[in-house]
Amino acid sequence: MAYPFQLGLQDATSPIMEELLHFHDHTLMIVFLISSLVLYIITLMLTTKLTHTSTMDAQEVETVWTILPAIILILIALPSLRILYMMDEINNPSLTVKTMGHQWYWSYEYTDYEDLNFDSYMIPTQELKPGELRLLEVDNRVVLPMEMTVRMLISSEDVLHSWAVPSLGLKTDAIPGRLNQTTLMAMRPGLYYGQCSEICGSNHSFMPIVLEMVPLSYFETWSAVMV
């Protein structure tokens, strides 16, 4: 999860987020090299005493600054497209959970079970227990098995919302009348926090998301109790 004065991205707990972190570093290095080159050229132009005012064209330079940006864009586009296809790939999910956005809470339904559904509201600040996080804790966490592919079906009952969990690399819009889907897989147990990431009204900041990733045996025990 995030911590105060954090400069980087949250720690990855899913294969997709690990790929996104690598892509971020890859793109950042390209931007750094371009910025350094531009700064170096500007410094040379400001400090040199050499001038050539009669130059009308320079085809070699024009060729270089046409081909080089094209190569750079390809180096950025190829890994980006690879990750986009990975995020859209859904193969034999072990569990399906339907998520509905409301003003201003989330509701969840485990579609593989006959009657396993609940609403998830933010816990008010005055009701928090010691150690709990302000504006991030909920009364009903989404308990899911780790190291298994989970499909999330996401929609909305009223206005636009967005279901986002940064540590898992997830952000999917919840649109009224439309059912979007995404997959998640956590590689380690723990609590993972997210929030609605689409401005949806006056209490937009007060509809957090909490995923509790647990071993399969614990999940089976929890689901049996809930049903």
UniProtKB/Swiss-Prot annotation:
It catalyses: 4 Fe(II)-[cytochrome c] + O2 + 8 H(+)(in) = 4 Fe(III)-[cytochrome c] + 2 H2O + 4 H(+)(out). Its cofactor is Cu cation. It is found in: Mitochondrion inner membrane. Residues 1-14, 88-227 are mitochondrial intermembrane. GO terms for molecular function: copper ion binding; cytochrome-c oxidase activity. Cu cation A1 binds at residues 161, 196, 200, 207. InterPro entries: CcO_II, CcO_II-like_C, CcO_II_C, Copper_CuA, Cupredoxin, Cyt_c_oxidase_su2, Cyt_c_oxidase_su2_TM_dom, Cyt_c_oxidase_su2_TM_sf. Its EC number is 7.1.1.9. It comes from the Eukaryota. It is a multi-pass membrane protein. The keyword Membrane applies. Keywords: Copper, Electron transport, Magnesium, Membrane, Metal-binding, Mitochondrion, Mitochondrion inner membrane, Phosphoprotein, Respiratory chain, Translocase, Transmembrane, Transmembrane helix, Transport. Cu cation A2 binds at residues 196, 198, 200, 204. Residues 46-59 are mitochondrial matrix. Belongs to the cytochrome c oxidase subunit 2 family. Component of the cytochrome c oxidase (complex IV, CIV), a multisubunit enzyme composed of 14 subunits. The complex is composed of a catalytic core of 3 subunits MT-CO1, MT-CO2 and MT-CO3, encoded in the mitochondrial DNA, and 11 supernumerary subunits COX4I, COX5A, COX5B, COX6A, COX6B, COX6C, COX7A, COX7B, COX7C, COX8 and NDUFA4, which are encoded in the nuclear genome. Component of the cytochrome c oxidase, the last enzyme in the mitochondrial electron transport chain which drives oxidative phosphorylation. The respiratory chain contains 3 multisubunit complexes succinate dehydrogenase (complex II, CII), ubiquinol-cytochrome c oxidoreductase (cytochrome b-c1 complex, complex III, CIII) and cytochrome c oxidase (complex IV, CIV), that cooperate to transfer electrons derived from NADH and succinate to molecular oxygen, creating an electrochemical gradient over the inner membrane that drives transmembrane transport and the ATP synthase. This is Cytochrome c oxidase subunit 2. It comes from Vulpes vulpes. The lineage of its organism: Eukaryota, Metazoa, Chordata, Craniata, Vertebrata.
